[in-house]
Amino acid sequence: MSEEESPYQLTKTFSNPKNNKIGLAIFLIGAFINLIHIYKPKGPSNNPTKRNYHISFGPPGKIRWFPLGIRKEVRSNVSGREIIIKMIITFILVQTTLITLDLYVFGATGLGLILSWKLFEVACANPEDEALLAERKQRLKEQREKKEQKKEQKKEKKTERRKKKKL
């Protein structure tokens, strides 16, 4: 069959309301999945037979995404398993928008899900987190300076020893 006879062709418009509704539904499902955070709180539970899970929007703490990982900067209890599950679900949902055969719906849904990942990242950032980060950076800077000073002192001692040996 040639391209003109094919019943399935990619379109580049938002003109089909059915496709738009499918894309919107997939986006809402994906955004909800990306924004929800299920975690088990630390400490003893009141009922040992019942699993005590909490659901919140966004992770508590501040995290930064990288292409192949996550850097937990301040008190974040996001697990690697949770991230992998979210990535797989997001990928599958974006690919399911291709059933609409509408490139605009596919692109808009994919972009929306990517933005929901970013929203998940910054959902629960606290002003205190910035102060903690600044304090941690300051401590690291001081540690580096101390190490450099120790290295310089060792070099000076070595040069002094060499001078004494030559004399």
Curated annotation (Swiss-Prot):
Record's bilayer topology term: Multi-pass membrane protein
TM ranges: 21-41, 87-107
KW Cell inner membrane (keyword) present: no
Top-level taxon: Eukaryota
Glycoprotein recorded as keyword: no
Subcellular location: Membrane
Name of this chain's protein: Uncharacterized protein C688.12c
Region (Disordered), start-end ranges: 136-167
